[in-house]
C-alpha cells in the first residue's frame, strides 16, 4: 500500500465522528496444526486468565533484544487476551526464553466479546488487541491506560499514516498491530463460477453452494455484505435500509454452515465450506498446502472494510513491566517481520516491511493496491450500539442457530 494512498484514505475515514464503538474485525489466521499451544483457554473461559502455558518450539533464528529494555524488573508472567492464533509461536517462545516469563494467551472471537468480558468485570489481563475504533469506548469506560511513550522507542518504526487518527489522536493509548480488509475466500477448484462481488457471493450461497458457506462471527463484517449489495454505506443505520438488509440476511440464514471466527480455515481446507466471508489471515497456510492452494481471496467490487488492530495495556495490569517490554519488543523490525510472515496481515512497521518477503509485499490480498484502497470504507464508531443493527444481528444469529 503506497504511503500517499494510505494517508489520503485515512484522512478520509478519520472525518467520521468518534464517540461510541464500531466493529472492525481481524482474525482467522493459521489453524489446526499451527495453532499456538499457548492458547490454553478459549473465548468462553472465566473472567481471569487461566493456567499459564507457552508456545512450543524454539525460534529459527536468534531473537533480537528489545531496543530499550526496561530498568524495572520484568515479571515472570504475562497475560494476553487476543484473537486466536494472532502471534507467531516463535516470538512467544523467544520472549519467554529471554525473560524467563510464561505467557498465558486467552482468546476472544470478536470485539464485542472482548468488551463484554471487560464490562462484566474481567481482570488479570495485561494486554489485549481490540480493533482501533474500540479504543474509544475502552478509554471512556476506563479499561485501558495511557502508555508511557518513553518505554516504547520502537514506535518510531510505525507508519505515520496510521497514527494521529480519531480513535487516538494523540497516540496515547495504543500500539498499532496489523491492518487489513474483509472479503471473500473461495475454493476455486470447487467454485468454478466467478466470485467478484458481494452479489455473486450471495447468489452462490443461496443457490449451488447452500450449506457450504461460513462467515466470521462479527456484526460489523457480516453487515457489510447486504449493505454494500444494496449500494449503502457499511455504517448505515436508517431503519428502512436496515429492513432491506434484514430481508437479505433472513433469506441467507438457512444456507449458512456456521458463524466462525476461529476455525473457518479448517472448514475451507476440508471443503466442508467452499465460500467464506472472512479475512486474509488463513490464506498463506491454505496456499502453501498443495491440497488447498486453489484458495483465493477477493475484495468485492462493491467495496468493503478497512480495519486496524491494536495493542493496548489494560488498566491495573498485574505485570506492567512485562507488558511494556512486550509492546516495545514486538515492534523490533526483525520480530515484527516474523509476525507478518506468520499471520498474513499487513504490518504497520515500516522497517519490518523491508524484511518481509517480496511475495507477501506483492500480494494484493495482504497489501492492497491503489484501486482497492479507493474502494475501502472505515467503520464509524458511532454505529456499533445502534439498536437497529444490534437487533438485526441478533435475529440473524438466532436464525442460523
Regions found by a protein language model. Give the residues of each.
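N-terminal secretory signal peptides
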Residues: 1-18, 29-36
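Bacterial lipoprotein signal-peptidase II cleavage site
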Residues: 40-49
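Early extracytoplasmic/lumenal segment of secretory-pathway proteins
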Residues: 67, 71-137
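Mature extracytoplasmic/periplasmic domains
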Residues: 314-374
Amino acid at each position: 500500500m503506497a504511503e500517499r494512498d494510505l494517508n489520503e484514505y485515512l484522512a478520509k475515514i478519520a472525518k467520521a465522528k468518534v464517540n461510541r464503538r464500531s466493529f472492525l474485525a481481524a482474525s482467522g489466521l493459521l489453524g489446526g496444526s499451527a495453532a499456538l499451544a499457548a492458547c490454553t483457554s478459549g473465548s468462553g473461559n472465566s473472567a481471569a486468565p487461566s493456567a499459564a502455558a507457552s508456545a512450543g518450539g524454539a525460534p529459527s533464528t536468534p531473537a533480537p533484544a528489545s531496543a530499550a529494555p526496561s530498568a524495572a524488573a520484568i515479571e515472570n508472567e504475562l497475560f494476553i487476551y487476543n484473537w486466536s492464533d494472532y502471534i507467531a509461536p516463535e516470538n512467544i517462545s523467544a520472549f519467554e526464553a529471554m525473560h524467563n516469563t510464561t505467557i498465558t494467551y486467552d482468546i476472544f472471537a470478536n470485539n464485542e466479546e472482548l468488551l463484554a468480558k471487560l464490562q462484566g468485570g474481567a481482570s488479570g489481563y495485561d494486554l489485549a488487541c481490540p480493533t482501533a475504533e474500540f479504543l474509544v469506548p475502552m478509554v471512556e469506560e476506563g479499561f485501558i491506560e495511557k502508555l508511557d511513550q518513553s518505554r516504547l522507542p520502537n514506535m518510531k518504526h510505525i507508519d505515520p499514516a496510521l497514527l494521529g487518527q480519531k480513535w487516538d489522536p494523540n497516540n496515547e493509548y495504543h500500539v498499532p498491530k496489523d491492518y487489513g480488509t474483509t472479503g471473500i475466500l473461495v475454493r476455486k477448484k470447487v467454485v468454478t463460477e466467478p466470485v467478484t462481488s458481494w452479489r455473486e457471493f450471495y447468489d452462490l450461497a443461496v443457490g449451488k453452494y447452500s450449506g457450504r458457506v461460513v462467515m466470521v462471527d462479527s456484526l460489523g463484517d457480516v453487515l457489510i455484505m447486504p449493505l454494500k449489495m444494496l449500494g449503502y454505506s457499511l455504517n448505515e443505520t436508517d431503519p428502512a435500509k436496515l429492513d432491506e438488509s434484514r430481508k437479505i440476511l433472513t433469506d441467507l440464514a438457512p444456507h449458512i454452515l456456521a458463524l466462525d471466527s476461529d476455525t473457518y480455515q479448517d472448514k475451507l481446507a476440508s471443503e466442508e465450506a467452499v465460500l467464506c466471508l472472512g479475512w486474509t489471515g488463513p490464506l498463506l497456510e491454505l496456499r502453501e498446502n498443495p491440497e488447498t492452494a486453489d484458495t483465493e481471496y477477493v475484495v468485492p467490487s462493491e467495496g468493503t472494510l478497512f480495519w486496524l488492530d491494536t495493542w493496548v495495556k489494560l488498566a491495573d495490569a498485574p505485570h506492567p513491566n512485562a507488558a511494556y517490554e512486550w509492546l516495545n519488543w514486538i515492534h523490533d523490525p526483525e520480530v515484527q517481520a516474523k509476525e507478518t510472515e506468520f499471520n498474513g496481515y499487513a504490518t504497520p512497521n515500516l522497517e519490518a516491511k523491508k524484511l518481509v518477503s517480496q511475495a507477501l509485499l506483492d500480494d494484493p490480498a495482504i497489501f492492497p493496491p491503489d484501486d482497492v484502497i479507493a474502494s475501502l470504507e472505515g467503520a464509524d464508531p458511532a454505529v456499533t450500539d445502534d439498536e437497529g443493527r444490534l437487533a438485526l444481528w441478533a435475529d440473524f444469529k438466532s436464525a442460523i442457530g
